[in-house]
């Protein structure tokens, strides 16, 4: 004869579900907010300010690059960040 026990076991505590990360293809991408405590600055130009505008479901940002030619400017994206660097080519 077989016996079965129906001991109740406590389920392990589960972490709350992770929030969906925003990406440029996400419906929530337009809810981007710049932190109030950190103004938009550019390390290569101390105190230099940029400008970001919301245009419908897109963003436009401007950076003063007048000292550089187009081939000196490098734009990369990674992890929901855009990086604009300028390096003078010899």
Curated annotation (Swiss-Prot):
Keywords: Chaperone, Cytoplasm, Nucleus, Stress response
InterPro entries per UniProt: A-crystallin/Hsp20_dom, HSP20-like_chaperone
GO function terms (MF aspect): filamin binding
PROSITE patterns for the chain: SHSP (PS01031)
GO CC list: actin cytoskeleton; Cajal body; cytoplasm; nucleus
Subcellular location(s) of the protein: Cytoplasm; Nucleus; Nucleus, Cajal body
sHSP domain span: 39-90
Main location, first listed in the record: cytoplasm
Domain of life, source organism: Eukaryota
Tissue specificity note: Found in both cardiac and skeletal muscle.
Record's subunit section: Interacts with C-terminal domain of actin-binding protein 280.
Stated family: Belongs to the small heat shock protein (HSP20) family.
Record protein name field: Heat shock protein beta-7
Organism: Rattus norvegicus
UniProt lineage: Eukaryota, Metazoa, Chordata, Craniata, Vertebrata
Name of the gene: Hspb7
């Amino acid at each position: 004869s077989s016996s079965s026990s129906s001991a109740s076991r406590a389920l392990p505590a589960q972490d709350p579900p992770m929030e969906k990360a925003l990406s440029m293809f996400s419906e929530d991408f337009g809810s981007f907010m710049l932190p109030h405590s950190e103004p938009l600055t550019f390390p290569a130009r101390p105190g230099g300010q940029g400008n970001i505008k919301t245009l419908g479901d897109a963003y436009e940002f401007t950076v003063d690059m007048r000292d550089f030619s187009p081939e000196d400017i490098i734009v990369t994206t990674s992890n929901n960040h855009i990086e604009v660097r300028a390096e003078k080519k010899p």
